[in-house]
């Protein structure tokens, strides 16, 4: 599912923002969440993604045994806005989009029977990628930690910031997560993927539509 900060609904072609494949070694289907995507599940499968400056929240209900993952970054129009933004600026375009990305994941989990008071969260990403918006990773980390605190969501583990991109695998039933540092050879591909996503957000948010939070 793709987060749409302008029209505030899922794009018609949801499958374009995650891919499904069978991992023979693990004997499970795996779903790769792409930038801007959200995926939730109550099935025996693994959710995975690659993260540079973007962040992912992995959230699950250990009683209902449902969980999900998002993959997003905050949209900034220019370096000045990025540099001077802070997480307590709740009405800024960046904060509203970040909140929308989180609420989309939470609401999808609640629709599967999860209870908000039982939810647990693990956070990943926000690396400082050389040559790509020097502060964007830091701002993404600041936002997601502030959001969790403000919403009273329990963060049981996190691996945020630093210089190295990450690969994440997440079991939506148990909340178990695996992390692997991405080799240098893969960094350019991931950077290009995130830059395309960032440019798409810039074009969309320039249209000036309001984001409705729920």
Curated annotation (Swiss-Prot):
Give, as one word, the top-level EC class: hydrolase
Membrane-spanning regions, if any? Answer: none
Q: Which residues form the signal peptide?
A: none
InterPro entries per the UniProt record, alphabetical: CheD-like_sf (IPR038592), Chemorcpt_Glu_NH3ase_CheD (IPR005659), Cytotoxic_necrot_fac-like_cat (IPR011324)
* CDD domains in the record: CheD
State if Hydrolase is listed as a keyword.
yes
Q: What is its EC number?
A: 3.5.1.44
Q: Which reaction does it catalyse?
A: L-glutaminyl-[protein] + H2O = L-glutamyl-[protein] + NH4(+)
Hydrolase among the record's keywords?
A: yes
Give me any GO biological process, just one. Answer: chemotaxis
Listed A to Z, the keywords are: Chemotaxis, Hydrolase
Q: Which molecular-function annotation in GO is an example for this chain?
A: protein-glutamine glutaminase activity
Its function, per the record, reads: Probably deamidates glutamine residues to glutamate on methyl-accepting chemotaxis receptors (MCPs), playing an important role in chemotaxis.
NCBIfam families on file: PRK13493.1 (NF010016)
- Similarity-based family: Belongs to the CheD family.
Q: What is this protein called?
A: Probable chemoreceptor glutamine deamidase CheD
Q: Which gene encodes it?
A: cheD
């Amino acid at each position: 599912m793709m987060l749409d900060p302008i029209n505030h609904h899922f794009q018609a072609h949801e499958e374009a923002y995650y891919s499904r494949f069978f991992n023979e070694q693990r004997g499970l289907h795996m779903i790769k969440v792409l930038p801007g995507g959200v995926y939730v599940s109550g099935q025996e499968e693994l959710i995975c993604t690659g993260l540079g400056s973007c962040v992912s929240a992995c959230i699950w209900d250990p009683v209902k045994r449902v969980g999900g993952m998002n993959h997003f970054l905050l949209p900034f129009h220019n370096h000045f806005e990025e540099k001077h933004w802070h997480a307590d600026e709740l009405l800024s375009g960046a904060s509203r989009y970040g909140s929308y990305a989180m609420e989309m994941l939470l609401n999808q989990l609640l629709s599967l029977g999860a209870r908000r008071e039982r939810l647990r969260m693990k956070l990943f990403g926000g690396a400082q990628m050389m040559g790509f918006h020097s502060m964007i990773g830091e701002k993404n980390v600041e936002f997601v930690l502030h959001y969790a605190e403000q919403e009273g969501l329990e963060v049981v583990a996190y691996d945020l910031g630093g210089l190295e991109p990450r690969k994440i695998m997440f079991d939506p039933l148990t909340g178990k997560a695996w992390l692997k540092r991405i080799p240098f050879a893969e960094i350019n591909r991931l950077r290009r993927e995130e830059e395309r996503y960032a440019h798409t957000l810039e074009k969309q948010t320039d249209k000036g539509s309001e984001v409705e939070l729920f």
